[in-house]
């Protein structure tokens, strides 16, 4: 099933500071949204499910639920990159515009943000995945926290030997910056 492009573009323009918790609960009950709680903080990570992809039941909450971290009241604490679509999933013409091209790396998405003075890593659907924990270790070892803007969410590709997806990077163990998103506004920050 193809989705009309104009409908999708409306969903991407989202600078709300809160998400509708009631709508999220409804989406979870219908099997379209996965919600996992942080073990230490009153935070929740939202991720769309494979059912959402199969049924193509997209709304703004689901398009942005790709590692979206929220507080109990729905305040957005961290924003990852929204869902991206394959060319055969969208009906309509994209308008020509400026773009930047990046090399696609073959690792896992790691999301870094700050909450009440603490740096936190997660993946699309977990605060405690091996990839999130390794990303934290790599960051501590190689980078300085004072260099990051605490009002932003950082999206990385985490690559290390034990996390080989398809491409074998040998002994490479590092974080590769994909994007920086201002958490309150949802706007991309120039890298």
Regions found by a protein language model. Name each.
Residues 1-191:
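Core nucleotide-handling region used for phosphoryl-transfer chemistry
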